[in-house]
Amino acid sequence: MTEDDFRAYVDAFNRADFDGFGRFYADDVVFELGSRKRIEGRENILAFYRQVRAHLDEHIELRGVLIGARNVAMYCRTTFTTLVDWPDYEFGATVKGDVREVETIAWYELDESGKRFTHIRGGRFKP
């Protein structure tokens, strides 16, 4: 994976292009949001993000990216803008118009081809 590849992934994610960012996931990818949530499988991750995107606009602003042979590290700021009330959102109730920002460091493990994510771990540290 090159930095341009990773930036294409983030761009597709920001546009809610599920096919575009989903192509970077291995079929059996594991996604962990700290200790709060674990999702296994590309289709389950995409279903999670479809639900999120029905309620929130999520935009990633890259602050730093490091590319290794089998890993990618990312530091980013993510802005969540609530589009419709979501009282039972698992990360805290939110109402239309709310804007939340968090900073995250994420670690991506790559398959043997170096093209698809097999494990994603994200840890939020701000706020």
Where are the predicted features?
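Short, aromatic-enriched amphipathic alpha-helices that serve as compact interaction elements
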Residues: M1-A16, F24
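Short, well-ordered alpha-helical segments enriched in acidic and aromatic residues
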Residues: A16-D28, E32
